[in-house]
Structures are given as C-alpha cells and as structure tokens.
Amino acid sequence: LKQDVESIIETAYTMIGIPYLWAGTSSKGVDCSGLVRTVLFMHDIIIPRDASQQAYVGERIEITSDFANVQRGDLVFFGRKAFSGRKEGISHVGIYLGNKQFIHALGDVHISSFEPADKNYDEFNTGRLLFAVRFLPYINKEKGMNTTEHNPHYLPQ
C-alpha cells in the first residue's frame, strides 16, 4: 500500500465497525492508538504503540478554531489540558479526515465530528481536544517513526 494520505484514510475507513478492545491491534478489535498504529503499519509505517507516545513524534500543530491548519491524515490528540505548570495528559487519538471529521476507536471504530451542527458531533472529545500532529513528512527522518526497511527490529537476519 502507498504511504500517502488518501491511501491511509481509505485503509482507516475499512476499519469502521471493528469493536473497541483495550490494547487491541487487529481486525478483531482495536483501541484508539491501536487503530492508528495498525492502519499505519498496513502502509509500512511504524510509530509508537501508545497515544501518549504517538503525540510526541512528527510536527505538533496547535489547532485553530476553524481547523484551517489541520490537514487530512493528521493525528488528533485528546486528554487533559496542561495546567499549573503540568504538561497535558494524552488519553485518546484519532485520524483527521477533513471537514472537522475524525475517525477513532471509542466503543467501536467510527467517524465523529467537531462541528456541533453535524449529526455525529462528539461533544465529549471536542471538549478535550488538545492538538494535532503531522507525521507523514517525518517518516524515516525522526526517531520513533520509520518504515520496516529502516527499523532494526525488521531487518533481515
């Protein structure tokens, strides 16, 4: 499979309806970070396992209110906002689809919206949205994000 945004999003759509399974990383069940990791691995992209680790690879994007600076395929992260000198707490991740929509695993894999007028509006996750991460330009250029060809765990023996 190609390592481009449209191909990755197409793969994510094939996961819709798969049940939530804590620590799951297969078509039998996934958690939020397992969905992201599995979709990307199907495109030969290896990223860290947990959302709290995935949040700190690539380029952090502070999301504007109109989402104009977020691109399809960016990862969107959720959790506890930073306060009193404490760093934010990452607890959830999804893949941004454009038009204020994102795909994620919570209950099952489905599409939610940040837009209050949409039928699939997700007030809970909108309220805990933290930032986005752009990762594709950084594959094989940054530690923790590479292809199997550049990962020592996948080199031929």
Where are these regions (language model features)?
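Boundary regions of SH3-family modules and the immediately adjacent low-complexity/disordered segments
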Residues: L1-T11, M15-I18, V109, G144, ...
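Second-shell loop/turn segments in exported
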Residues: P19-S27, F83
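Flexible, substrate/cofactor-facing loop regions flanked by secondary structure
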Residues: L21-A23, R37, I46-S52
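Aromatic- and glycine-rich peptidoglycan recognition patches
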Residues: E88-Q157
